[in-house]
Amino acid sequence: MRIINAEGLILGRLASKVAKMLLEGEEVVIVNAEKAIITGNREDIFAKYKQRTELRTRTNPRRGPFYPKRSDEIVRRTVRGMLPWKTDRGRKAFKRLKVYVGVPKEFEGKEFETISEAHMSRLATPKYVTVGEVAKFLGGKF
């Protein structure tokens, strides 16, 4: 089992690396999901996520598509987008992923990994928003 600390990591790069690990059969736990970052203009990011959460079908709005508002679920959904979700292999890989807001008691004191290729120090521009800020904007509880 790999425990990854998402603090200061770029969400898309983190998700692609985690998806690869899951497809290789590893169990992955992501902690501090609310501290992952999304790069780009603040207003554009908020508008994009707001539009996603408001998407519905015209015939029956209860059919979806459904996009999450909580920060841990936003990270899970991003990883899911990088897996072959419609195949059995992709669904089994997705079940091996656990995402947490903060650090749960069961993982306190354990050593966390980080993904150097996904760290925000590689950014050329300081424009970014944390996943926690996006979740708060959408009305998420965490």
From Swiss-Prot:
Belongs to the universal ribosomal protein uL13 family. It comes from the Archaea. This is Large ribosomal subunit protein uL13. One of its GO terms (cellular component) is cytosolic large ribosomal subunit. CDD domains: Ribosomal_L13 (cd00392). This protein is one of the early assembly proteins of the 50S ribosomal subunit, although it is not seen to bind rRNA by itself. It is important during the early stages of 50S assembly. Part of the 50S ribosomal subunit. GO terms for biological process: negative regulation of translation; translation. InterPro entries: Ribosomal_uL13, Ribosomal_uL13_bac-type, Ribosomal_uL13_CS, Ribosomal_uL13_euk/arc, Ribosomal_uL13_sf. One of its GO terms (molecular function) is mRNA binding. Keywords: Ribonucleoprotein, Ribosomal protein.
